[in-house]
């Protein structure tokens, strides 16, 4: 992974030019992240068209090379971002997608690894925790160099909801959603705070904020994707911006703490699974995992979420008989 240490030229290969992928590329252009973006998709005309369209925005932002790419172009990339996969339909859970997207994923990871790619995989296709684990198994890469978007979007939704409730800037809210990016995710209320004031203290000072309001707020966060899909067919702006933030942390060697899908090696009593938790990320991938002290209820929620993921993961690999590199 020699090129990622060269701050003057950072190369990203995006696999998947659907709504999420193209929105991600646009976010990268607007924020001036990376100097080269290659876009891979089975629909070549779409990647060519998007490359031209995005390049037209460069005079308003910063110089960048954007082009329709092949898997072989990943050989000297710093980062491969995978958004390709079957989209989530109305009424369909993220876990329902697993069998369809496992097969798609294998057709992506194999040629990327064969190209000589030696950077970092960032996975966003759903179900993200399972597909990130699958990317690790299929690639044979070290676990720190395969990461998923995890609960980054859920956490952003959570912070925004709290911010709207108390009328502050969402960037001043510090709170996390952990676990599966999906139905078994949970809020870490015990460490949530607004500018250092805990949620418990805030509620005590504002009796109009009842517990049932907080419960409803989290449920709306958890189910936000279903509502958006019902209204407009897909979610993409939020996750695309989250992916751009993660990419920036990797490429700029930030050592940023972000809620990501990472490999558990004893943390929270979990092993051999990818799941959402705050972690430190830099140009080498995951530097370390922050094991937040959880309440008994939160710990129970983490175990429940992991158990659900483990079951689906085991069933999916058994059913699809996928050959892996580790």
UniProtKB/Swiss-Prot annotation:
InterPro entries: L-lactate/malate_DH, L-lactate_DH, L-lactate_DH_AS, Lactate/malate_DH_C, Lactate/malate_DH_N, Lactate_DH/Glyco_Ohase_4_C, NAD(P)-bd_dom_sf
UniProt GO cellular component terms: cytoplasm
Binding sites annotated in the UniProt record for beta-D-fructose 1,6-bisphosphate: 159, 171-174
Effect of residue 174 to D: Shows a lower thermoresistance than the wild-type, even in the absence of fructose 1,6-bisphosphate (FBP). Not thermostabilized in the presence of fructose 1,6-bisphosphate (FBP), Mn(2+) or both
GO MF term list: L-lactate dehydrogenase activity
Regulation: Allosterically activated by fructose 1,6-bisphosphate (FBP) alone under acidic conditions, while it requires additional activation factors such as divalent cations (Mn(2+)) under neutral conditions. Under acidic conditions, Mn(2+) is an inhibitor in the absence of fructose 1,6-bisphosphate (FBP). In case of L.casei, L-LDH binds four fructose 1,6-bisphosphate (FBP) molecules per tetramer, while usual allosteric L-LDH binds only two fructose 1,6-bisphosphate (FBP) molecules per tetramer.
Subunit structure: Homotetramer.
NCBIfam families, A to Z: L-LDH-NAD (TIGR01771), PRK00066.1 (NF000824), PRK06223.1 (NF004863)
Protein family (similarity comment): Belongs to the LDH/MDH superfamily. LDH family.
Function, in words: Catalyzes the conversion of lactate to pyruvate.
Protein name: L-lactate dehydrogenase
Organism: Lacticaseibacillus casei (Lactobacillus casei)
Organism classification: Bacteria, Bacillati, Bacillota, Bacilli, Lactobacillales
């Amino acid at each position: 992974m020699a090129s990622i240490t060269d701050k003057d030229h950072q190369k990203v290969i995006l696999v998947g030019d659907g709504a999420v992928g193209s929105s991600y590329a646009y976010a990268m252009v607007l924020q001036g992240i990376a100097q080269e973006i290659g876009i891979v998709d089975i629909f070549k005309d779409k990647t060519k068209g998007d490359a031209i369209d995005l390049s037209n925005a460069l005079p308003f932002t910063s110089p960048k090379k954007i082009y329709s790419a092949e898997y072989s172009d990943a050989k000297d990339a710093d980062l491969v971002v995978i958004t390709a996969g079957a989209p989530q339909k109305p009424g369909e859970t993220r876990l329902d997608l697993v069998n369809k997207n496992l097969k798609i994923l294998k057709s992506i990871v194999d040629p990327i690894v064969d190209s000589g790619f030696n950077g970092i995989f960032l996975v966003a296709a759903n179900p993200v925790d399972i597909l990130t684990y699958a990317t690790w198994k299929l690639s044979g890469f070290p676990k720190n160099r395969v990461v998923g978007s995890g609960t980054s979007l859920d956490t952003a939704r959570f912070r925004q909801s709290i911010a709207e409730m108390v009328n502050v800037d969402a960037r001043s809210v510090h709170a996390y959603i952990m676990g599966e990016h999906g139905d078994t995710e949970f809020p870490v209320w015990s460490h949530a705070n607004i500018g250092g004031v805990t949620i418990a203290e805030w509620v005590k000072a504002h009796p109009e904020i009842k517990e049932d309001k907080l419960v409803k707020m989290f449920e709306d966060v958890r189910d936000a994707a279903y509502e958006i899909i019902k209204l407009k067919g897909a979610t993409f702006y939020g996750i695309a911006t989250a992916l751009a933030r993660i990419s920036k942390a990797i490429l700029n060697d930030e050592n940023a703490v972000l809620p990501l899908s990472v490999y558990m090696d004893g943390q929270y009593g979990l092993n051999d699974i990818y799941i959402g938790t705050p972690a430190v990320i830099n140009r080498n991938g995951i530097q370390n995992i922050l094991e937040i002290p959880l309440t008994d209820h939160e710990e129970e929620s983490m175990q429940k979420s992991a158990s659900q993921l483990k079951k689906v993961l085991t069933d999916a690999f058994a059913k699809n008989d996928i050959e892996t590199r580790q």
